[in-house]
Amino acid sequence: MAELYPSLTQCAIVATAFKILLFPAYKSTDFEVHRNWLAITHSLPVQEWYYEKTSEWTLDYPPFFAVFEWALSQLAQYVDPAMLDVQNLNYDSWQTVYFQRATVILSELVLFYALNRFIRSDPQPTKHLAHAASLSILLSPGLFIIDHIHFQYNGFLYGILVLSIVWARKQSKLLYSGIAFAVLLCLKHIYLYLAPAYFIYLLRAYCLDPKSVFRPRFGNAFKLGLSIITVFGLAFGPFVYWGQLLQLKDRLFPFSRGLCHAYWAPNVWAMYSFTDRILIPFAPKLGLPVNQDALTSVTRGLVGDTSFAILPEISKEYTFVLTLLSLILPLIKLWLRPDYYTFVGALTLCGYASFLFGWHVHEKAILLIIIPFSLIALKDRRYFSAFRPIAVAGHVSLFPLLFTAAEFPLKTVYTLLWLILFLFVFDRIAPVPERPRIFLVDRFSLLYITVSIPLILYTSLVHQLIFGLESSITPSQPLEQRIPSPVTSASHSSLRFWYRMSAKASMTP
């Protein structure tokens, strides 16, 4: 890989230096969430971790992530012991801030390692494509905004996902791929949305003969089953023994939360909410009944349901059925053609389905689409054409996470530079497909990107200048103005990729 320039290591060093400069930047309530989890796991016995509720930010990640926090707390006690006091709510000394920021960067070494393995796993003729895709993930505005300013550990988690995907490329490493994904599920359960693709792929490619489903490989099935049971046993076994499984279920799956998150993800339900608001002034003329209690209801991401004034209410069962239905064709394709590219494509479409139709979707869940899609976006120009609009819409939809004036130039300039650089490079190096592209659809993508630039400027800057700073952080105002554009783009991108995945043409290189 010596001929690939700039190298992954060089970019990682420069990016790390830049991230260190951001230590004093804005941090969200997620910073306090993770500080509180450090305190809980350090100060209390394991049996009390999922019962502690001194803070409203209770522990609601699976046990392996709690162990990860415990491991960090063993170092934190030497930096500032006060951060590990459960009663010390909203504690943010500079030592605490610097320590927690540094742990995000260090944990991202997992992603760096996984991307290195991804490049090495690619055949020599296409290694430059894998290198470009890896750089785009390493320098992702999504990880930059969510992890290094807003504050989370997504780089670490997506590193495990990428490593699992890389291992899925070779028959000899399929067992490791399944184990890595099981570990990932025990770290953060949002990746359950990707589980259907893993289940079908490992069943067809590892447990059954790829050439005939009637020839099971009992040895492989036993090894995979035993490995998965062992991973989940280590994670959840102690809590089963203590009779705390129902408590874990309530913490990990709080379905009492509303349909839409506080800062609405640009999905179908955000558009549904937007349409409901648009219909309110016309309801009397159209003779539509109005739910008066819903007129002042705007979800804030806390416990409670989203209400609609005009349109019917949406249940969590309904969102589950829609999500499942949207997965049927990609999973059938994966069953019939259990190869690497079909698998990653199915993973991406699982991300699309969960993001567009899921219950209480966080805007950060857009990375479930962008990260795996990035790994195959350069397979040919048709893949890239489907990737381009979601890359723009997905990253722009993260802007409301950083609403302070100081971070406006950071998020805007960094994201625009990334989009211009990588979309230009991807456009230049993406191979021309054997089958012709639909140029009318490509023009729609370019039109969306053109419209996005003034939309970003208005919602992030001009709106504040006209209506004042406070108005920019009200979810029902500028955020709603963004919704139709990103939702349209995300839906368009998913439909294009779904069509590409469902096509009869082979997806093997």
Curated annotation (Swiss-Prot):
Pfam families according to UniProt: Alg6_Alg8 (PF03155)
Principal location listed in the UniProt entry: endoplasmic reticulum
InterPro entries: Glyco_trans_ALG6/ALG8 (IPR004856)
Coiled coil: none
Subcellular location: Endoplasmic reticulum membrane
Enzyme class: transferase
Annotated catalysed reactions: an alpha-D-Glc-(1->3)-alpha-D-Man-(1->2)-alpha-D-Man-(1->2)-alpha-D-Man-(1->3)-[alpha-D-Man-(1->2)-alpha-D-Man-(1->3)-[alpha-D-Man-(1->2)-alpha-D-Man-(1->6)]-alpha-D-Man-(1->6)]-beta-D-Man-(1->4)-beta-D-GlcNAc-(1->4)-alpha-D-GlcNAc-diphospho-di-trans,poly-cis-dolichol + a di-trans,poly-cis-dolichyl beta-D-glucosyl phosphate = an alpha-D-Glc-(1->3)-alpha-D-Glc-(1->3)-alpha-D-Man-(1->2)-alpha-D-Man-(1->2)-alpha-D-Man-(1->3)-[alpha-D-Man-(1->2)-alpha-D-Man-(1->3)-[alpha-D-Man-(1->2)-alpha-D-Man-(1->6)]-alpha-D-Man-(1->6)]-beta-D-Man-(1->4)-beta-D-GlcNAc-(1->4)-alpha-D-GlcNAc-diphospho-di-trans,poly-cis-dolichol + a di-trans,poly-cis-dolichyl phosphate + H(+)
One of the record's GO cellular component terms: endoplasmic reticulum membrane
Keyword Oxidoreductase tagged: no
Protein name per UniProt: Dolichyl pyrophosphate Glc1Man9GlcNAc2 alpha-1,3-glucosyltransferase
Membership in a protein family: Belongs to the ALG6/ALG8 glucosyltransferase family.
Cytoplasmic side: 25-96, 164-178, 247-315, 377-382, 427-448
PANTHER family xref list: DOLICHYL GLYCOSYLTRANSFERASE (PTHR12413), DOLICHYL PYROPHOSPHATE GLC1MAN9GLCNAC2 ALPHA-1,3-GLUCOSYLTRANSFERASE-RELATED (PTHR12413:SF2)
Pathway: Protein modification; protein glycosylation
Spans through the membrane: 4-24, 97-119, 143-163, 179-199, 226-246, 316-336, 356-376, 383-403, 406-426, 449-469
Keyword Transport among UniProt keywords: no
Topological domains, Lumenal: 1-3, 120-142, 200-225, 337-355, 404-405, 470-509
Function: Dolichyl pyrophosphate Glc1Man9GlcNAc2 alpha-1,3-glucosyltransferase that operates in the biosynthetic pathway of dolichol-linked oligosaccharides, the glycan precursors employed in protein asparagine (N)-glycosylation. The assembly of dolichol-linked oligosaccharides begins on the cytosolic side of the endoplasmic reticulum membrane and finishes in its lumen. The sequential addition of sugars to dolichol pyrophosphate produces dolichol-linked oligosaccharides containing fourteen sugars, including two GlcNAcs, nine mannoses and three glucoses.
Enzyme Commission designation: 2.4.1.265
Membrane association type: Multi-pass membrane protein
GO molecular function: dolichyl pyrophosphate Glc1Man9GlcNAc2 alpha-1,3-glucosyltransferase activity
Keyword annotations from UniProtKB, A to Z: Endoplasmic reticulum, Glycosyltransferase, Membrane, Transferase, Transmembrane, Transmembrane helix
